Curated annotation (Swiss-Prot):
The lineage of its organism: Bacteria, Pseudomonadati, Pseudomonadota, Gammaproteobacteria, Alteromonadales. GO terms for molecular function: rRNA binding; structural constituent of ribosome. The gene is rplW. Gene3D superfamilies: 3.30.70.330. GO terms for cellular component: ribonucleoprotein complex; ribosome. One of the early assembly proteins it binds 23S rRNA. One of the proteins that surrounds the polypeptide exit tunnel on the outside of the ribosome. Forms the main docking site for trigger factor binding to the ribosome. This is Large ribosomal subunit protein uL23.
Length: 100
C-alpha cells in the first residue's frame, strides 16, 4: 500500500496543451505533470484516490530540459515527467468544477 502522503506529492499539475485537449476528447485521457521519480503504480493510485475515478492505464515519458542562455551564461531547465492517464469508460475529471 502506498502512503497517502506520497500520493499527494506524485501529481504536480494537469498539463494543458493543444495535444492534451485533443487526446482528452478522443480517448478519455488526462495528462498530468508528475514527480520525476513517480512510478506508474503510484500515479494510478494517486489519480484514483484524489479524483475518485477508475484508471484504465498509465503511460509516462520524461521531457529533457532545454539548454537556455541568459546573457553570457548557459544554463539548463530541469527535466520533468508527464503522464497520460486513460480513464475507464464513463469516468470523467472536471478541473473547472461547476462552471458552465
Amino acid at each position: 500500500m502506498i502512503r497517502e502522503e506520497r500520493l499527494l506529492k506524485v501529481i504536480l499539475a494537469p498539463h494543458i496543451s493543444e495535444k492534451s485537449t485533443v487526446v482528452a476528447e478522443k480517448t478519455n485521457t488526462v495528462v498530468f505533470r508528475v514527480a520525476i521519480d513517480a512510478t506508474k503504480a503510484e500515479i494510478k493510485a494517486a489519480v484514483a484516490k484524489l479524483f475518485e475515478v477508475e484508471v484504465d492505464s498509465v503511460r509516462t515519458l520524461v521531457n529533457k530540459g532545454k539548454t537556455k542562455r541568459t546573457g553570457g551564461r548557459v544554463g539548463r531547465r530541469s527535466d520533468w515527467k508527464k503522464a497520460y492517464v486513460t480513464l475507464a469508460a464513463g469516468a470523467d475529471i472536471d478541473f473547472v468544477g461547476g462552471a458552465e
